Regions:
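N-terminal leader/targeting signatures
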Residues: 2, 24-25, 45
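N-terminal capping/lid subdomain adjacent to the active-site entrance of alpha/beta enzymes
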Residues: 28, 35, 40-190, 194-212, ...
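Short helix/strand-capping turn motifs
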Residues: 317-324
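Catalytic core of soluble alpha/beta enzymes
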Residues: 166-308, 330-331
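C-terminal helical cap(s) of enzyme catalytic domains, especially alpha/beta-barrels
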Residues: 286, 305, 313, 330-344
Length: 398
């Protein structure tokens, strides 16, 4: 098969990927949707419980083992100063349910599927014992960069820098990236705009920031059309910055649309928003693009799921965004999953009994999260019954 080359001349990066995706026989729609009811079910690969033929665990059982946690942050990250999540225990270990508060139930249900898969289904096969990770630099003032980087253990090989923060300017971003390059002259740098720029702003910013030898820019703009136009503009101007899609994968009705449109050079994949390791693996395989595995500001329990996904992939061309435990004041585990010299070991993570008590959320927060789990479980159960029936019919040739 003829392949397209992804080039970054300044860094000597050459990446190849298939120009045409593998044939998709079933639309990859979101598994749960309050707008489409029972008919909108898993597509290419259903949730792990469907593909494994395993019933969803009973809601009462989930709630009885759920621990709602409240963990402070070292720095403000996406406007968050305290991270709340729910840890769920099952026969195969622990899972973490940590969708951000603003996510609606239809979106949060994917995260519950991922947590339940980690706790109630056997782990998938892995091919490595450790995974490369990047450190993450929030949108802090330039003078704080050295202090934040000191929170990481050992040498930092790759660093993701947050940019396009609301209320900040391009000058702030340039100063932050420059400070990072000064502190880490040999590290691979990449930026994440979280779709915070318009198309003109993104072109201006990436042209300026390319002087710092960026590996790639993650989600600089919000739409697929703007991503395609931005890639074309950068190519025409010979600006050597690759484009990665994140929100266009994890928040899209069809996470493969951005790949089919050739709007990105690589994709950033998080297990939880896609419903778990099994479904996320399918998205990567179908996309035909290099993948970066990332996390969503979770404790070591959630990070372990992302690490497992990364360890199951045959290739990891870039450092994974799985080093965010270092941004927490503490962790639920006494042996947190943090990077040492840019690598994290592949192993399960479990909370320490004492920390389940000391880090427990207050009554109001606990009640809010448990009610959210109930609503999401009902969405999952409704989708599971329909998907399980269709999955069975397809297996019988109907």
């Amino acid at each position: 098969m003829k392949k397209n080359k992804i080039l970054n001349p300044k860094l000597g990066v050459c990446r190849e990927y298939p120009p045409v995706l593998k044939e998709v026989t079933v639309p990859f729609s979101r598994a749960i949707s309050t707008h489409h009811g029972d008919s909108n079910i898993p597509g290419i690969t259903p949730y792990g419980f469907v593909s494994e033929g395993t019933p969803l665990p009973p809601l009462e059982k989930i709630l009885n083992t759920a621990h709602v946690m409240s963990v402070g942050m070292r720095v403000t990250f996406r406007g968050v100063t305290t991270r709340h999540s729910t840890l769920i225990r099952g026969p195969y270990g622990w899972g973490e349910f940590a969708p951000f508060p603003e996510y609606d139930d239809a979106e949060a249900a994917h995260w519950l599927s991922s947590a339940l898969e980690a706790a109630y289904l056997p782990p998938t096969v892995t091919v490595r014992e450790q995974v490369p990770v990047n450190a993450t630099l929030p949108a802090v003032p330039a003078h704080r960069v050295p202090d934040v980087l000191n929170n990481y253990n050992g040498d930092i090989q790759e660093l993701k820098i947050k940019v396009a923060e609301r209320g900040q300017t391009l000058d702030d971003d340039i100063a932050r990236v420059a400070a990072a390059r000064t502190a880490l002259p040999n590290a691979r740098l990449k930026i994440d705009a979280n779709a915070g720029w318009t198309l003109p702003q993104a072109f201006t910013a990436l042209t300026a920031l390319s002087d710092y030898n960026l590996l790639y820019a993650e989600q600089p703009v919000g739409s697929i059309n703007d991503m395609k136009q931005l890639r074309t503009q950068l190519d025409n101007a010979q600006v050597p910055v690759l484009i990665a899609a994140d929100e266009l994968v994890r928040k899209a009705d069809d996470p493969l649309t951005v790949a089919r449109a050739h709007a990105a050079d690589l994709i950033v994949v998080k297990a939880a928003p896609l419903g778990g390791v099994r479904r996320a693996s399918a998205v990567i395989a179908q996309s035909g693009l290099p993948a970066v595995i990332s996390s969503a500001l979770e404790t070591s329990v959630g990070i372990a799921t992302g690490v497992h996904l990364a360890a199951s992939l045959p290739e990891l061309p870039y450092g994974c965004g799985l080093g965010t435990v270092s941004l927490l004041n503490t962790d639920v585990s006494s042996t947190p999953l943090v990077a040492e010299n840019g690598r994290i070991p592949v192993r399960p993570a479990a909370p320490e009994e004492a920390r389940l008590k000391t880090l427990a959320a207050d009554h109001a927060t606990r009640t809010w999260w448990l009610e959210r789990i109930k609503r999401c479980w009902r969405l999952l159960h409704r989708g599971y019954v329909t998907a399980e029936a269709r999955h069975g019919h397809e297996n019988m040739g109907d």
